[in-house]
């Protein structure tokens, strides 16, 4: 039998202000939180990158701030949906080589796609001051007892996206979160 708290969680990440990561209530399941009467596992946040540290080729620690607060983020690029296995990359490369040998009319498109895939493969390059959208899970750093985000998607955005994001959050909070009858 499935735990009712798991079956009732949001299917999509809950879009939140950073301050609400710390306001969310824990549940019996350490991976599930509840806020505004809504149980959830994943969150989506947006803000300005204020610190980047402990960076390797595939992992990094970040600090993201919005108008409401700051949160620490751990990001492992191999855990995202954009990762491609070495076997898949080898197969793509071999197919590309074959297509170029035989004069495939779509070779320029394939070349562009290969470049884009290669540039995205397990690459961690973030700069302080850039705007970012982050999707991940809340977890508690056991050494400090502080809530953090374990991110599986980090995308650099823009100031224009930040404005749209803040408007969208205002709408969600006014229409769905704050006035949620299950609160």
Please identify what each model-predicted range represents.
Residues 1-183:
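OB-fold and OB-like single-stranded nucleic-acid-recognition modules
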